[in-house]
Amino acid sequence: MKVVDKIKSVTEQGQTAFSFEFFPPKTEDGVENLFERMDRLVSYGPTFCDITWGAGGSTADLTLEIASRMQNVICVETMMHLTCTNMPIEKIDHALETIRSNGIQNVLALRGDPPHGQDKFVQVEGGFACALDLVNHIRSKYGDYFGITVAGYPEAHPDVIEADGLATPESYQSDLAYLKKKVDAGADLIVTQLFYDTDIFLKFVNDCRQIGINCPIVPGIMPISNYKGFLRMAGFCKTKIPAELTAALEPIKDNDEAVKAYGIHFATEMCKKILAHGITSLHLYTLNVDKSAIGILMNLGLIDESKISRSLPWRRPANVFRTKEDVRPIFWANRPKSYISRTKGWNDFPHGRWGDSHSAAYSTLSDYQFARPKGRDKKLQQEWVVPLKSIEDVQEKFKELCIGNLKSSPWSELDGLQPETKIINEQLGKINSNGFLTINSQPSVNAAKSDSPAIGWGGPGGYVYQKAYLEFFCSKDKLDTLVEKSKAFPSITYMAVNKSENWVSNTGESDVNAVTWGVFPAKEVIQPTIVDPASFKVWKDEAFEIWSRSWANLYPEDDPSRKLLEEVKNSYYLVSLVDNNYINGDIFSVFA
């Protein structure tokens, strides 16, 4: 979806749109750390995020890779910067074709900074001289597919700012006229260069309107987190620093925490003034850190850490090809990135109902599904690599996870448990102690308000429902006992399969069971989570392989603990259990 349309949708609901900018880190570890920060920031619901291109086009390939993961794995509407620096038309078109094929629809068109080692911008042979040329090219070749954003400079472009820190009136007006040419050529959004004097920004907006620039103008807000970094960035951009800001920072310039706290306060006051003058969007330059951006938005009342809203129980895709997707199997609830990877080859995605046409189309397992950031790998090492002398030791690790003592799980990409798990974590702890090793669960919910903490989704005004669900590993003996007991509970349905594909079930192999649904005003019933036997058979290969790839392999090859985990993998069953009585059922009764 185009960013300008998303901003319009948000502001028409009387809300303030906000967004975040990131840049490509220099190291592989830095990239993985960035994705973890992105995940946290995206949970607050930004309208979009953007990723920079890098000075002189130096990070082109990495920017393309990060942009694709942002759109398709982090699931946030992504805008990619694209510059003219060192970019002949062939490379520009390659970049545009790449992001289009990855479902990205938004570009920030820039001239770019001079190449490394040069003071002035130099047009590369076969390339463009300015952002206007780039806008014209994108519109000419790609029509209306891309949303095009351009940069606005409240104090004029740094190239025309004089030694005294000011642009001449003629240079300023010329800069405005050039901005209008970019908009007239097809740009539909303006994001500004950083500034610290809000009066300058407000004058800039008014001046734009006076000459017929009517598209949204989004202020770029750069939080101050480090004094030297602040001076360096302001100097590079030739940004005016108000006297009161200098006076406030000078006494605390050597105290980074004090500078950061004041930076949050100052940016908050800037934003309050901007919003009070009718501006409805904010763009935060994060510098790849999250605390200042979160602090500003919390001060403004735009986010509340205790009330993070969800449009669905899982993060809605941003890829233009998946925007209508609203149904998924519950099995990947804790591994959404793996699910996206295994379904990226689909031409159509379930909308409204699951149907039975997709089960055979999952991609095969690859190393990607088991790759982990080093930070998460370290956490698993710390929490899960202990001597395992018996199955009781294995059960104890699962119990610790369920009662909240562990923050990682080999079977989850998430940090800690889902918030709703706290409702049933005591019961989960008991059944894990008894040999039912849970990896996925949800409590029953009957007509809870859709904005309820922990279990709500879909926004206010609706009601949500859930059937209780448990997914666990257990021995054949325990499965046999469970099957026998379940005969006294007609509302319970189950499926079980082992690594050798021995199948036990009391449901039909084509029976799809909706286990989460919501009812909202003037809408059809939404059922975003289902249990599907065909998908369960696909998931079981991944679930069993995790015993080896994500846990046993953390031990030395000849370690007895590793041998025990492999024995569990090869002998246990994976079980999916649903209590279809969501009104007064008790899924844990069958374990009594």
UniProtKB/Swiss-Prot annotation:
**Regulation of protein activity:** Plant MTHFRs strongly prefer NADH over NADPH. Not inhibited by methionine or S-adenosylmethionine.
Give the EC number(s) listed in the UniProt record.
Answer: 1.5.1.54
Q: Which SUPFAM superfamilies match?
A: FAD-linked oxidoreductase
Q: Which reaction does it catalyse?
A: (6S)-5-methyl-5,6,7,8-tetrahydrofolate + NAD(+) = (6R)-5,10-methylene-5,6,7,8-tetrahydrofolate + NADH + H(+)
A molecular function (GO) term: methylenetetrahydrofolate reductase (NADH) activity
Against Gene3D superfamilies, the record matches this protein to: 3.20.20.220
Alphabetically sorted, this entry's keywords are: FAD, Flavoprotein, NAD, Oxidoreductase
List the GO cellular component terms: cytosol
Tell me the domain of life: Eukaryota
The biological processes this protein is annotated with in GO are:
methionine biosynthetic process; tetrahydrofolate interconversion
Q: Please list the residues that bind substrate.
A: D113, Q193, Y285
Q: In which pathway does it act?
A: One-carbon metabolism; tetrahydrofolate interconversion
Q: Which of this chain's residues are annotated to bind NAD(+)?
A: E21, F22, F23, P24, P25, K26, T52, W53
Residues that coordinate or bind FAD: T52, W53, H81, R111, G112, D113, Y153, H157, P158, D159, V160, D175, K182
The protein's enzyme class: oxidoreductase
Q: Which residues form the active site?
A: E21 (proton donor/acceptor)
Entry cofactors: FAD
Question: Member of which family?
Answer: Belongs to the methylenetetrahydrofolate reductase family.
Question: What function does the entry list?
Answer: The probable reversibility of the MTHFR reaction in plants suggests that they can metabolize the methyl group of 5,10-methylenetetrahydrofolate to serine, sugars and starch.
Q: Please name the NCBIfam families in this protein's record.
A: fadh2 (TIGR00676), fadh2_euk (TIGR00677)
Subunit comment for this entry?
Answer: Homodimer.
> What name has this protein been given in UniProt?
Methylenetetrahydrofolate reductase (NADH) 1
User: Species name for this entry?
Assistant: Arabidopsis thaliana (Mouse-ear cress)
Name of the encoding gene? MTHFR1
